[in-house]
Amino acid sequence: MEGMLSSGDQQRLVSSFLEIAVGQTAETARQFLQATSWKLEEAIQLFYIGNEGGMLQSGTHTQPASNDDAAAQSWGAATGTGNEMILPNDVDEVRAPLPVVRETLYGESMYYGAMRVGNSQPEPNSLIAFRNFSEEPKSPGIWEPDEGDSSASASASASASESASAPRDSLASLYRPPFHLMFQGSFEQAKTTSSSQDKWLLVNLQSTTEFSSHMLNRDTWANDAVSQTIKANFIFWQVYDDTTEGRKVCTYYKLESIPVVLVIDPTTGQRMRMWTGMVDPENLLEDLVPFMDGGPREHFASLSKKRPRGSFSLTPHSKPKEDVAKDEEEEELQRALAASLEDNNMKESSDDQSTIIPEEVAVEAVTSAVLPTFPPLPEEPKGGDRSLQCRVGIRLPNGQRLQRNFLKTDTIQLLWSFCYSQLEESERKKPLKLTQAIPGESKTLEYESNLTLEQSGVANSMISATWE
C-alpha cells in the first residue's frame, strides 16, 4: 500500500492524523499509518488504543521542546485572562478517547426473541398487536402512553415524534389484547384456578400471521356483553402459538388452524367446544349459553347420574340360569294376558269414549286456562335512533336460536309473544319459562312484572326459553 501512495498522499494522511491526534509528531503519525497500511481510520483507532495501554511511553514518541514551549505560551496566555486554576503541567493532558463500538446486524428472529426475554423491548409494529402477554401489561408500550411523555419538560423533538407516532398507536389500540379479561399464568395454573372457582376454562390461541386473531381482539373480546359473560362465568386464557405454552396446547388438542377458541373442562382437560377463525360476538354468546347454565362440577355430577346403576353388577352373559328362566316365564304370562284382554278392549272401546275424558283433552284444558293472553307483537324496529333500540337473543326449547330488535321501552311480555310466534301450533299451549343467561347467574323473568327491557336488564342479552 505504501508503494502505491505518492509522497503527497502520504503527507496528506500524516497531516490528517496530526489534526485528529493533537500534539503528536509527524514521526508518530507515520509509524501508526505504516502499521495499518496507510489506513487513516484504523491508524487513529490503534493510536487511541495504544494510548490507553501505555504503549506510547517510549522516547521516540515524546514531543519536542519547541512544541512544549508553544503550548506553554498558549496556556499561559489563557491563564492570564483570569483562569488561575489551570496548572502548566495540564498542557500534556489529552481527553479520554471515545470507546470503540462494534455493531452487528441480526435477523428478525433475533429481534423478536429479544422482545420476549429482554428487559427493554423495542417498539413493536402497530400491526403486531401483542408479543408477550405476561410482560406487556406491566410495562408501558405501544398500547399505553408513558406517563413521562406527558411532562412539561419534553423537548420539541420529542413532541414531534409523539405526534408522528400517534396514528400508529391509535391503530394498535384497536387490536389491543383483552388484558382486563386474561388470566396471567401457565395453562396448568389456569386449569387449577378454573377448577377451584368451578368455572369453565375459555382458551384463545392467537397468531400474529393471521388477521383473524386481531379481529377477535377488536370485535369479539372488546364487546361489552362478551366481556361481562366471560367475567361472570369463565376463566379466560389467551396465548400465542409460537410460545412454549402455545405449542403445548396445539400439540395436546391437535390444533391445525389458528386462531382457535376452546371451552375446556378444567377437571378432566376435555375439550367441550371449539371455534376456529373469527367468531362474531352474537354467535359466541349463543354458543356459550349451555355452559352458563352450570359449572364443570354440575356437569360431572350429571354425567355420574346418567350411568346405569348396575354398572358394577354381573353382565347379561353371566346371569344365573334361574334368573333367565324366571324372565322367560314372565314374558309368556304377559303375552297370554295381552291376548286374553284384546277382545275385551275392542268391545268396551265405544263405551269408554263416551264416558271417559281423554287425558290429552284434560291437559289441553288445563294449559289453556293457565296461559295468559299475550300482547300483540309490534313490527320490528329498523333504522331510526339506535340508542333507543336493543337486541335480544333467544334460545327456544327445541334448540333454535333467534335474534330480534326491540325498543328499550317495550315490556318483557313481548318476549313471550315473540317466542310463541316462533313455535309450532301444537307447542303453543305449553307454558314457557324465560331465564336471563347473562351476566352472572341465571335470573328467571316474571311475566306479571310490567318492567321494560331496559329496566329488567334484558336489553342486549341472551334469553333461554324452557318448558315449565
Swiss-Prot record:
Tissue specificity as recorded in UniProt: Expressed broadly in sporophyte and gametophyte cells.
Deletion phenotype: No visible phenotype.
Residue segments, region Disordered: 138-168, 299-329
PROSITE patterns listed in its UniProt record: UBX, UIM
InterPro entries: Thioredoxin-like_sf, UAS, UBA-like_sf, Ubiquitin-like_domsf, UBX_7/2, UBX_dom, UBX_domain-protein, UIM_dom
Gene Ontology molecular function: protein-macromolecule adaptor activity
Signal sequence region: none
Chain intervals with Low complexity compositional bias: 150-166
Superkingdom, natural source: Eukaryota
Domain UBX intervals: 385-466
Keywords: Acetylation, Nucleus, Ubl conjugation pathway
Compartments reported by the entry: Nucleus
Domain (UBA-like) ranges: 7-48
Stored CDD domains: UAS, UBA_TAP-C_like, UBX
Modified residues (N-acetylmethionine): 1
Domain UIM: 328-347
GO annotations of cellular component type: nucleus
Acetylation found in the keyword field: yes
Subunit description: Interacts with CDC48A via its UBX domain and with ubiquitin via its N-terminal UBA-like domain.
Domain commentary: The UIM (ubiquitin-interacting motif) is required to engage the NEDD8 modification on cullins.
Functional description taken from the UniProt entry: Acts as a bridge between CDC48A and ubiquitin, suggesting a role in targeted protein degradation.
Identification of the protein by name: Plant UBX domain-containing protein 7
Species whose genome carries this gene: Arabidopsis thaliana
Upper classification of the organism: Eukaryota, Viridiplantae, Streptophyta, Embryophyta, Tracheophyta
